[in-house]
């Protein structure tokens, strides 16, 4: 794997002062980031999340997905724990890129679900590659993680890379009328573990 560490700096946020570690995937040219809080290289399991880039949800407050809500909830949880890691992976639109994501949204506006839209554009339902996580975690000295995710594929990917997942921590937040079908599709077609959140129980999003 051609992922190399480039530089690190402090990153003050509303949730605490994190350390931001920058990585470059030399094979793709993509730049990835890890945020850490506290001591994470002591061998004890670290609360963490693998978060794929979502410009619309993370930065533009979109209600079409739950990404922005999950990002905030994960950072809040790490801050409450006092230590943890968040890998921010530049895999926009489940790996299809921003412009193709907008094309997929247009198909969804016409009635397709999130999986059907990707497939009509010639992509797999999920194109993300979590192999980039191993060298990032190795650089940070993390060998065991309590993973905040609803996606069993992330657990399997980390375990397959030799990272011990000691616990899966559900991260269910952000359900609203605009993303109800999207979440139901993630549960029904992508195997995400969303409990009652895809059974028609719509909550008012709070962001945490």
Swiss-Prot record:
Enzyme Commission code: 3.5.4.25
Residues forming the catalytic site: 126, 128
Question: What pathway does the UniProt record associate with this protein?
Answer: Cofactor biosynthesis; riboflavin biosynthesis; 5-amino-6-(D-ribitylamino)uracil from GTP: step 1/4
Against Pfam families, the record matches this protein to: GTP_cyclohydro2
- Which amino acids does the record list as binding GTP? 49-53, 70, 92-94, 114, 149, 154
Q: Per the UniProt record, which residue ranges are transmembrane? A: none
Say which family it is in.
Answer: Belongs to the GTP cyclohydrolase II family.
Give a short account of what the protein does.
Answer: Catalyzes the conversion of GTP to 2,5-diamino-6-ribosylamino-4(3H)-pyrimidinone 5'-phosphate (DARP), formate and pyrophosphate.
Instruction: Please give the name of this protein.
Output: GTP cyclohydrolase-2
Q: In which organism is this protein found?
A: Azotobacter vinelandii (strain DJ / ATCC BAA-1303)
| Gene name in the database record | ribA
